[in-house]
């Protein structure tokens, strides 16, 4: 049973401005593991990576129903890729998490669906 749905869209140029020489933004948004991946990226690929993670984490917080804040922080949520490249969301939730991330020339968007783990 679906217990939550969240979606977020972010302008790539907004993220590009925030990461331009500002390590604090990356430390606030990305986990250590995500920052290690980001170190190997440059230019538009780095912007897409950070924007996708930002949107995924915002979408998750909306699906949970709290938003980013005291109960859920950016660093409580990690986005990884499975063996086939599919994004997966790592968090402490008991729910099954379905994540989709997409990019266009101007935007990154993510959708999260939370499913009850009991069948």
UniProtKB/Swiss-Prot annotation:
Substrates-to-products reaction catalysed: apo-[ACP] + CoA = holo-[ACP] + adenosine 3',5'-bisphosphate + H(+)
Single GO MF descriptor: magnesium ion binding
Binding residues for Mg(2+): 8, 58
UniProt key word Disulfide bond: no
InterPro entries: 4-PPantetheinyl_Trfase_dom, 4-PPantetheinyl_Trfase_dom_sf, ACPS, P-Pant_transferase_sf, Ppantetheine-prot_Trfase_dom
Reported cofactor(s): Mg(2+)
Enzyme class: transferase
Cross-referenced HAMAP family: AcpS (MF_00101)
Entries under NCBIfam families matching the protein: acpS, pantethn_trn
Family: Belongs to the P-Pant transferase superfamily. AcpS family.
Protein name: Holo-[acyl-carrier-protein] synthase
Native source species: Bacillus cereus (strain AH187)
């Amino acid at each position: 049973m679906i217990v939550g749905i969240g979606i977020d869209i972010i302008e790539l140029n907004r993220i590009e401005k925030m990461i331009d020489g500002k390590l604090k933004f990356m430390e606030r948004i990305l986990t250590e593991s995500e920052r290690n991946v980001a170190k190997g990226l440059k230019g538009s690929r780095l912007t897409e990576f950070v924007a996708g993670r930002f949107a995924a984490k915002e979408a998750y917080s909306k699906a949970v129903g709290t938003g980013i804040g005291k109960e859920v922080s950016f660093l409580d949520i990690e986005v990884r890729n499975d063996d086939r490249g599919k994004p997966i969301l790592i968090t402490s939730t008991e729910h099954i998490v379905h994540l989709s991330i997409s990019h266009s020339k101007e935007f990154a968007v993510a959708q999260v669906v939370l499913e009850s783990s009991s069948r």
